């Protein structure tokens, strides 16, 4: 890592963490702009999509299941799910005998909402990562490797 000779500062364009941070926020701006017409935040979209994904293999998906899978704070997850429930995009219930756990399920309106938003999101993702070209698969592999550390 080079330091500027005049200031003895680290060149931020050579710091991987800073580059990742900057790229993440550029990507996030694009995704949030894409989801805005669907009246969803990125966190809301991710929770709805993940709920649908996890529901394929489980009869019940709890708030804790969602939070753990996404590495989200449980309290924040509960607050966002409550807001989505008020909008009619999911319903929450309790399994008999387990009053502490809340289980969520997409409503038809929630499923329709994420299906429409997902199409636009995938187009935005493709547009954002187009500069990777043939390297996208390798890039994704590197990201998965980082996440497994």
Regions found by a protein language model. Name each.
Residues 1-38, 87:
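N-terminal leader segment of winged-helix/HTH proteins
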Residues 3, 82-141:
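Charged, amphipathic alpha-helical coiled-coil/dimerization segments
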Residues 19, 46-50, 112:
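Pre-recognition alpha-helix immediately N-terminal to the DNA-recognition helix
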Residues 25, 29-73:
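N-terminal helix-turn-helix DNA-binding core of bacterial DNA-binding proteins
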Residues 63, 81-82:
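Short, hydrophobic-biased segments on the C-terminal half of alpha helices
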